[in-house]
């Protein structure tokens, strides 16, 4: 049986004037239309092709070599292209737009909005469907991340405390406001770092390396910018936090620690209005 909403490796069983038929096992033969057959891939009988399986507008299984923006079981930020009496329709990179039923909305959507969704397969109809109700699809088992571990983040929701983000397509985490030193919005994908896994299971995140690695990374960044600017930067431990954030994406406190260490190592000189290489 083919995995609907996922990539499948299927064998070519028949050529026709309008496409190739692939062996879908218990689902029978699945059509790969001519328009989805690249000229540079083999397509002889018994060849195996890597294709994405979905339902067409008549709810028939169809194969494509086009790449959707998200597969079943994954989270993504998708653009609303239409809202009608049936529900909200999202652009996910395939000709047939993805349905987000009204019952799966968290807020009212209009065309042009972006929405972070999980994509699942309806058990009764096998239709690929989106939901904005994310909690039920995130892992509730205790996470085993280590402090400082690099992870993939999908920023999902702004809160009073910062931004909730999905970690490695599995867990909720929180980027606290004091860890954010650049523009952020829901739907952004970022590299992040585990700051803390609390006893209650909640996970704190950072957008910068943490611990000793963070200090080393920031020190290297400061030295790099100094070398790029003839050994001088018009920023110091007395500078406005906004200037420091715009230059290095860190808090003033972390910046002061870094230049203090560089000063002790004899690599820079600190003035009231600038720092210089020695």
Model-identified regions with their sequence ranges:
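Single-stranded RNA-binding regions, centering on S1/OB-family and related RNA-binding modules
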Residues: 1-278
């Amino acid at each position: 049986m083919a995995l609907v909403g996922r990539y499948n490796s299927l064998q070519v069983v028949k050529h026709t004037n309008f496409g190739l038929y692939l062996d879908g096992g218990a689902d029978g033969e699945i059509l790969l239309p001519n328009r989805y057959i690249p000229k540079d891939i083999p397509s002889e009988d018994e060849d195996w092709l890597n294709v994405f399986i979905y339902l067409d507008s008549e709810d028939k299984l169809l194969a494509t070599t086009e790449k959707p923006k998200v597969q079943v079981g994954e989270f993504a930020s998708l653009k609303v292209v239409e809202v009608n009496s049936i529900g909200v329709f999202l652009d996910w990179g395939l000709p047939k737009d993805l349905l987000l039923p009204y019952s799966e909305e968290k807020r009212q959507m209009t065309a042009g909005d972006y929405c972070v969704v999980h994509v699942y397969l309806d058990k009764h109809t096998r239709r690929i469907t989106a939901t904005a109700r994310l909690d039920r699809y995130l892992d509730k088992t205790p996470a085993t991340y280590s402090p400082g571990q690099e992870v993939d983040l999908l920023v999902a929701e702004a809160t009073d405390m910062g931004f909730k983000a999905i970690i490695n397509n599995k867990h909720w985490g929180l980027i606290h406001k004091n860890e954010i030193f650049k523009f952020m919005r829901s739907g952004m994908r970022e590299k992040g770092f585990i700051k803390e896994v609390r006893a209650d299971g909640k996970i704190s995140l950072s957008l910068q390396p943490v611990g000793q690695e963070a200090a080393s990374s920031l020190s290297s960044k400061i030295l790099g910018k100094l070398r790029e600017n003839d050994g001088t930067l018009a920023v110091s431990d007395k500078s406005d936090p906004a200037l420091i954030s715009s230059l290095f994406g860190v808090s003033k406190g972390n910046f002061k620690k870094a230049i203090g260490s560089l000063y002790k190592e004899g690599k820079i000189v600190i003035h009231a209005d600038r720092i210089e290489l020695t």
